[in-house]
Amino acid sequence: MRFVQLPSGEKLPALGLGTWRMGENRRSRATEVAAVKAALQMGYRLIDTAEMYGDGGAEEVVGEALHDEMLTRSISREEVTIVSKVLPSNASHAGVLRACERSLKRLKLDVIDIYLLHWPGSAPLADTVAA
């Protein structure tokens, strides 16, 4: 896996798994979890998701797959970078905090490594960043 070094010195995988369109249909859940697990087994170490993907369902898929892989394989949480995104409609200071807590619960994590504003909205950017 190739890595990209950020100005801070931190290194991130150059390639990640996107989860848009996952979590939209409960009947596909097992297949989607298996796909994320297969990606982790193949060496993917960056997973991108968002609260809007499947109305939170994609985060649940990622959470289940990552949790299972940490229990059954030699992958640790520290090896994987999780990216999630907040919707502009939740981008107020209080909204970001609530949305992040919901995402953490769905992902079964204590920390989201990179948390982004999905796209600009009407909330002042200073409020979003402050959260």
Which functions belong to the PLM regions below?
Residues 1-80:
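N-terminal binding-site loop/beta-alpha segment at the start of enzyme catalytic domains
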Residues 20-22, 50-52, 85-89, 117-120:
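Active-site beta-loop-alpha junctions enriched in small/polar residues
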Residues 41, 88-131:
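Glycine/proline-rich, positively charged
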Residues 78-82, 112-114:
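Residue-level recognition of the N-termini of beta-strands and the immediately preceding loop/turn
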